[in-house]
Amino acid sequence: MNNYRKDLSSIVSLVNQGSRVLDVGCGDGELLEYLKKDKEVIGQGLEIRQDRVNKCVAKGLSVIQGDAAKDLSLYPNKSFDCVILSQTIQATGKPKEVLSELIRIGRETIVSLPNFGFWEVRLNLFLTGKMPITKRLNENWYETQNIHLCTIADFVNLCDELKINIKKTITFNSKKIKTFKEKPRAIENVIAEEAVFLLTS
């Protein structure tokens, strides 16, 4: 999986063979396509942009157009073995409500996100006094879809508030990947560029 984002490799490692999977905000279907080939999942996708839905369908993927903030409520409780939200929670209008819905409809939920507490982001903001632009967060504030950026600590606190169980955390930067049973160490809020969480209700 060398040509894939690091978080996608980590996500794939957390998905069980043959699972029923819903990929929310699936983009062009990169992750779904890999999961079907590598883990033989029964996969579905939900994507807000019609052009991306069209790309997915052209690849033979089962993807529908929809808005996570509105359409997740249509799915029955525990209707999937695993629900995935990859690099999308910070772009949703109501992340708390979306996370609650993911937990409701999936036996397990996987969430990956960029860490706004990463030391390079902090340093960039401190030195420039402007919204940071880094390799991972590479758009100007007026162009980005990231409307609710958060840190690893913020996300852990939200899980605590919603009484969501963190079963495993994978954190990484350009040099290291670390895996934690349950919650990550506090220092990961500074040294990790991204994180992947495996969650249950």
Question: What are the residue ranges of the model-derived segments?
Answer:
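Class I SAM-dependent methyltransferase "Motif I" SAM/SAH-binding loop
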Residues: 25-27
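Class I SAM-dependent methyltransferase SAM/SAH-binding core
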Residues: 30, 34-71
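S-adenosyl-L-methionine-dependent methyltransferase catalytic module, highlighting the catalytic core
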Residues: 97-101, 108-201
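A short acidic, Gly/Pro-enriched loop at the edge of an enzyme's catalytic core
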Residues: 73-82
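A short SAM/SAH-binding and catalytic strip from SAM-dependent methyltransferases
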Residues: 82-94
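Conserved alpha-helix/loop element of class I SAM-dependent methyltransferases that forms part
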Residues: 2-18
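Alpha-helix C-terminal capping/helix-to-coil transition sites in glycosyltransferase folds
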Residues: 17, 78-79, 105
